[in-house]
Amino acid sequence: MSPTPAEPIVTVIVPGRDVAAYAAEALASLQAQSLDAWRAILVDDGSTDATGALFAQAAASDPRFTVLTHPTPRGLGAARNAALDLVETPFVGFLDGDDVLTPDALRRLTATLTRSGSDIVAGAYVRLRPDETGGYTPGIVQPWVRAATEPERLGVSLAEHPDVSGNIVAWSKVSRVELWRRAGIRFPEGKLYEDQVVAQRLYTTARAIDVIPDVVVHWRERADGSSITQHKDSVAVLSDYLESMRAGIAVLDAAGHRAAVRARVRLILDMDVPPLVAIAQRHPDDAYRRALGAFVAELATRADAEDIALDDATVSLRSAAVLW
């Protein structure tokens, strides 16, 4: 028997392209939520596998699911934007079709916003990594995630909590739909890492921000290496990655949030740059090194101007990258 849905208060947008191997678990994590009052818009973005059929089956058995189909792939940004236009609930969140919500995620996120009156709440997340059994095991909360979400803070501004700027993923948050429409926020289309600039726009335009330390999402690292974040050795992927970080910093700059800029520059140099330098050192294409070197030089100049303290390892890698 199909469940009788409660009046929904939050819409979860679930884009997916060729995620048939993971979609059932993602959708089951929605149905296992302690909060019943949700609906989900499932966007099949031109899949060539059984993703569309799985989405359709879910919608046929549970009226809380609605399916939107793109006959040809348009990308995550376009998929999310198309679904955003259909949202009728007060709150909206996101879940990628290969990730997993923790059982109490929606209740905690929506209850926090209801209690505080803030525009957006960000929670913690962990990597879901392949294990020796052929399955996946969740990891620990990483330091930059803890810095953004611990301890719980309600009704703060970006100026009061600049480290929240390090939480740049779409799917660890719930926000008021009114915030998106008031500020005219849309995801960039035709680009990878499209959520980074959107996160900074949400933070800079929110009237108040909440953060909670609860792990709300398990973010999958696919065993077959097919997710976008596992292809940073591609020059094209690197280009979009660097541009997304530049664009996010530009949003913070334009809004006058110097402390958040400092926090973001430090985090990128400490966390994002070292693995990219390691890739560049063995990469066969000089274009990769030149692009990364130019980006690191920009951030190094900014770090020096802002007197941002960096650890010794980061300084060493920065020096190597600038020489490219």
Tell me the role of every PLM-derived stretch.
Residues 1-241, 247-250:
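Nucleotide-sugar donor-binding/catalytic module of glycosyltransferases
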Residues 221-324:
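C-terminal subregions of glycosyltransferases and related glycan-biosynthesis enzymes
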